[in-house]
Amino acid sequence: MSRCSNAALMTVVEDAVGARVAARTRNMSNGVNYREKEVNDLTADISDSDSDLDSEDNKHGKGDNDTAPIWLQDDVHSDEDIQLDSEDDSDTEAVQAQVVDKLAKDTKSEQKSLDDELSEMDTKTVSLKLKKLNEFVRQSQVYSSIIADTLLHRSNEVANANTKDNSNSDDEEHSSKKRKTKKKSITDFFKKQKKNEDTTTQNGAPDDAAIKQPRLLKNCILKPYQLEGLNWLITLYENGLNGILADEMGLGKTVQSIALLAFIYEMDTKGPFLVTAPLSTLDNWMNEFAKFAPDLPVLKYYGTNGYKERSAKLKNFFKQHGGTGIVITSYEIILRDTDLIMSQNWKFLIVDEGHRLKNINCRLIKELKKINTSNRLLLTGTPLQNNLAELWSLLNFIMPDIFADFEIFNKWFDFDSLNLGSGSNSEALNKLINDELQKNLISNLHTILKPFLLRRLKKVVLANILPPKREYIINCPMTSAQEKFYKAGLNGKLKKTMFKELIKDFFTLNDEYIGHVSNRSIRDFINYKLSGNETSNTDNKINPTLLQMDKLYKKNLQMEISNKKLQNMMMQLRQIIDSTFLFYFPYLHPEDLTLETLLKTSGKLQILQKLIPPLISEGHKVLIYSQFVNMLDLIEDWCDLNSFATFRIDGSVNNETRKDQLEKFNSSKDKHNIFLLSTRAAGLGINLVGADTVVLFDSDWNPQVDLQAMDRCHRIGQESPVIVYRLCCDNTIEHVILTRAANKRNLERMVIQMGKFNNLKKLALNEGSFLKANKAGVNVTNKDLVQELSMLLMSDESNIGFENGGQKENKATEGQLTDKEVEELTNRSLEAYKANRVVDLPHVKLFETTSGL
């Protein structure tokens, strides 16, 4: 790299550091109550009472801002000092010992397997329940057949009407020449398919009757599966049916939709057409129309200057194009400009990210249903979830005359009336019943959905087109600091531990600005603040050093602690596994943060330190996703300390900035090699094929969110093999999240055991299924979960299969990937993407390979 390039890069990094330094400030606040709450006590942490030391300042008539700068210097010599981490943790060890004892007792008492349980059950009871089950399945089959017959009848009426219109038309010959294809009947979609329902079509060429690519679609050649998707969309349109195009992310739902509108436009129905989408995707829609259908008139109906400006823009557009064309707008504008939108007669309505309409009672779906339109199309890359109410909401939107009553729909599929008595059954019998219900209900619901839902998977239709992708799980054992926080969280002592560590770090890391104070004084100050006896102290009893320390504490730290809400145990544990600095930041001046200190707070950052620099040096571009915006701050600090130039998108980044960053990052000439993204805010409507590496710093409870994040770079347009690194801390709450992902994705090769952790198993696998659409999910207390999480943490073996047994790492080598592991993780050869490879390394497991060779 040239000297000029280096200088430019450093300028970028320094600007980023300066912006973040300005953002980190502290102020004074209310006092804090350090007494620990019960595990399930989720009340606020801030106390309204002030300590006696607070009144000390008032006594002298001066506040923090009026005092001279404080400089600490006590008289404890270094050879007389103590170790800060030498405090007695016997209470924590006692709790852990109780957990181990309970684990041993539970192991000894559980003797029978699920198979034995089932074999000893009363045979007549099992037979009776299975008979009821079969009757229920047949009942739902009847309903599916009724719906199919209704759709057939309706489509035949539309077909007959079209035939009659064509016979009376003077342009019949012209129309037949224009189409040059045989119109396909919707009955074709009711024929039995031998292929898997999810894949529907093969990657072959369409048949002779398929619609050809519209002439107005330019600068691209539709792939065979996209032509087949277009054919399906046109068939629905010609049969008077609405539909859901649910192709997996990255298969080109946008270009297929544009092709459909181009076809309709060529058939002399020139609109107006309305496309509504999330704000973040509007520019992408505009770019796609400009690229693939430049001759179609398109308006981006959006603006922040008020209704008058927007309405004038729309009226001018319609005046210019004779009331035709395509209007693209956001959900927010639909809700704001309802009257203007409703006043138009739209020929076609396309709703992008249609899965957002799953709540029938939300205002958006109510307003969209009021829009005057002849046809509706929903686009979604998220598969339909196993929830009757959500499924019916989508069906009601696209076919309101057929799916008009949820109660009737629910009656045919609600199994509660069967009285199968799941509470009194064995786990084995419940599993048998649930599996049978799921299998048959899904089959029957697919019978209903088959005519107007199309979903193709990348691994099927792009098997020979898209570059391969492989996904690893990397075990990132907690550092000593993280393990201390995690155990404290489980034992109900997180607030106290956070306070102690903040005090220690603040007074040891900022001595350049506040002077030196001994470890003994720090310990005394901690004990003083935690004693609860501050109100009994008088002036002559207070050590002058402690008084000075307390002034610094109130000025710089009190706000930090007061504002930290410790109310959600699961969230606390997940954040601890990312970094302890998510709970406090001890530096007076953020620019003083060192790489060494930052790495001590996070085993995951230690893995990045070993893994990412070699990738950057080889020219790879990396996407790093996190669930937590404040974790993105720390990762950005880590990038700055390594002189990596970064872009960033989270919920606070405006649309124009997003667009500019995406364009630059996807350019091969741009020097930014890492893109930091908030998983939820940046998981949709973003194309980042400039990257070939994805890091999931933490996983989402919904595995589809993580898959969408990967699809930002593993999509059409990607030319390089892709590698995904999923960072995970074994035998912690992340183990539960990973179990959920593996289960939902049906990854049989990745066997993840939950053993005796029944409540954690329920938490991992519960998803509000078809079977209990409106029932509460897992009903266990925090105490039950804490107990099992403690047992999981103390397990001697890894439940995922890592060699080193979860957290039982040697802390001297914690987070250290071996050279062999780094070689495996960075291997881009085609050999590394072969299917069914076995990767057996201490910290690394191969989770999944797609489009494998």
From Swiss-Prot:
Q: Which Pfam families match?
A: Helicase_C (PF00271), SNF2-rel_dom (PF00176)
Q: Which subcellular locations apply to this protein?
A: Nucleus
Tell me where in this chain the Helicase ATP-binding domain is found: 234-401
Instruction: Give start-end ranges for motif DEGH box.
Output: 352-355
Alphabetical keyword list: ATP-binding, Coiled coil, DNA-binding, Helicase, Hydrolase, Nucleotide-binding, Nucleus
The answer to whether keyword ATP-binding applies is yes
Compositionally biased intervals (Basic and acidic residues) = 56-65, 185-198
Protein name (record):
Uncharacterized ATP-dependent helicase IRC5
